[in-house]
C-alpha cells in the first residue's frame, strides 16, 4: 500500500507501489525498485526477506553475513523428473536472454541478500523484458550474476524445506529440534 498505517521514522514509502503476485515477474520488478532506492541511499547490501521468516542468528551475525551476496540455491543433483523437466524448460527459455549455456543456469530461493557491488553488475539488466513471466524471482537474480561472470556458491541462507531440492517453504512444526538442526547447519533464517 502507498499509505501504510504505521512505519518507522525515516522509512521510505513508495507512493506508487508495484502490485505483486506470487510467482510473477512483478516480484522481480518490485525488488529491483527497492534495491534501486537502497542503492541511492548508499546501502552496502540489500536483504530481501518475508514476514514469515525468523532469524536464527544474532543481529551481529546476520549483519556480518549479509554484507556479501547470500543465496540458497537448488542443488543440481537429486532432482525428481518433474523438477528436471521444469528447470530444463525454464533454462531453455532464459539461456539466450542471459547469453549462457543451459548447464550454467541455476534456480534460487526467492529470498536472499545481495551486496551493492554485486547489484551494480545487474543494474543494466532490464527485468521488464525477461522472458520468464512465472517464477522469475527464482531465476533472474542468480543467473544475472552468473551472466556477469560472478560465481554464485550455494549458501545456507534460508531453511525452507526438509527436501533440499525444493525452493518453496514447506509446512512444519517449528520446534526445538528443527531450530537446532537449522542453527547447526549454519542457516541464517528459517521460513515457515
Predicted features along the sequence, with ranges:
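ER/Golgi luminal nucleotide-sugar-dependent glycosyltransferases, focusing on the catalytic module
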Residues: 1-192
Amino acid at each position: 500500500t502507498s499509505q501504510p498505517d504505521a512505519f518507522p521514522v525515516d522509512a521510505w514509502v513508495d507512493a506508487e507501489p508495484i502490485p505483486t503476485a506470487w510467482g510473477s515477474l512483478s516480484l522481480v520488478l518490485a525488488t529491483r525498485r527497492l534495491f534501486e532506492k537502497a542503492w541511492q541511499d548508499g546501502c552496502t547490501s540489500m536483504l530481501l526477506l518475508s514476514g514469515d521468516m525468523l532469524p536464527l542468528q544474532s543481529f551481529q551475525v546476520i549483519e556480518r553475513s549479509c554484507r556479501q551476496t547470500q543465496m540458497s540455491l537448488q542443488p543440481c543433483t537429486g532432482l525428481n523428473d518433474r523438477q528436471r523437466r521444469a528447470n530444463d524448460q525454464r533454462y531453455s527459455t532464459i539461456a539466450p536472454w542471459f547469453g549462457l549455456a543451459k548447464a550454467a543456469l541455476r534456480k534460487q530461493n526467492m529470498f536472499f541478500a545481495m551486496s551493492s557491488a554485486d547489484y551494480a553488475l545487474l543494474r543494466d539488466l532490464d527485468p521488464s523484458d525477461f522472458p520468464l513471466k512465472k517464477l522469475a524471482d527464482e531465476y533472474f537474480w542468480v543467473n544475472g550474476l552468473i551472466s556477469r561472470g560472478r560465481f554464485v556458491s550455494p549458501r545456507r541462507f534460508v531453511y525452507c524445506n526438509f527436501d533440499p531440492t525444493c525452493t518453496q517453504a514447506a509446512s512444519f512444526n517449528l520446534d526445538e529440534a528443527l531450530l537446532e538442526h537449522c542453527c547447526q547447519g549454519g542457516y541464517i533464517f528459517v521460513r515457515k
